[in-house]
Amino acid sequence: MKKQEQNQFLKEFGISLIKMFPKYIDKAIYSKGELTLHVKPTNLIALMKILKNHTNCQFKSLSDLCAVDFPEKKERFEIVYNLLSVRYNSRIRVKTFVDELTPVPSVTCLFQAAGWFEREVWDLFGVYFTNHPDLRRILTDYGFEGHPMRKDFPLTGYVEVRYDDEQKRVVTESLEMTQEFRSFNFTSPWEQIEISKPNIKEKK
C-alpha cells in the first residue's frame, strides 16, 4: 500500500470508527499521517477490545505505552497507547487523560506486554492501574519516595543513596540542600587586554 493510499485509509478508518462506536470515542485526530483516538478511562477496555479483535482493525500488538505530565491541566496525565496491526500494516494511537487520583484500567487482560509498561508508568508518574496482576516499582530502588518523572518532582530527589565504606553496605540518607560557597568574581576575557589610550593634550 502506497503512503497516500495508507493516509487516506487511516482518515476513512477514523471516520468509520466514530460512526460505529460514538459512545466510546470522544475525539479522533488525524495529523501527519497518524490517527489518534481520545477515550475516557471508563471506555478504554471496550475500545481496546474492538481495536484488537474487530475484523477491520486487528491491532493485536501493543508496541508502547507511556505517559506525559502536564501539571497546568486538571487532568494532568496523558496516557498514550501505541498499537500496531501487522495484518493491515498500520498503526494507531489511543490517549486517555486522568488526574492524580483517578485510576486507569489495566489492559494486561488484552496485551501481555502492558504488564511492564504499566509498572513503568506507575513507578515514574504515579498513575495507578486497576486489576494489574503485579503493580510494583520497576526502575527505582526499594523504598523510593515519589515519582521522578512528574514535573513537580525535585531534580535532586528527596534522599541520597550511596555505598558506605565503613558499614560495607548501601545506605539512604536525607538529602542536604546546602550549597557550597562559590565565588562569582570571574575576570572577563575582554578585561585582560590592555588598550593604550591616546595621549590627548588640552589646548590652552
Curated annotation (Swiss-Prot):
It catalyses: a ubiquinone + NADH + 5 H(+)(in) = a ubiquinol + NAD(+) + 4 H(+)(out). Keywords: Electron transport, Membrane, Mitochondrion, Mitochondrion inner membrane, NAD, Oxidoreductase, Respiratory chain, Translocase, Transport, Ubiquinone. Its EC number is 7.1.1.2. The keyword Translocase applies. It holds the Pfam family Complex1_30kDa. InterPro entries: NADH_DH_suC, NADH_quin_OxRdtase_su_C/D-like, NADH_UbQ_OxRdtase_30kDa_su, NADH_UbQ_OxRdtase_CS. Gene3D superfamilies: NADH:ubiquinone oxidoreductase, 30kDa subunit (3.30.460.80). GO terms for cellular component: mitochondrial inner membrane. Belongs to the complex I 30 kDa subunit family. Complex I is composed of about 30 different subunits. Core subunit of the mitochondrial membrane respiratory chain NADH dehydrogenase (Complex I) that is believed to belong to the minimal assembly required for catalysis. Complex I functions in the transfer of electrons from NADH to the respiratory chain. The immediate electron acceptor for the enzyme is believed to be ubiquinone. This is NADH-ubiquinone oxidoreductase subunit 9. It comes from Reclinomonas americana. The lineage of its organism: Eukaryota, Discoba, Jakobida, Histionina, Histionidae.
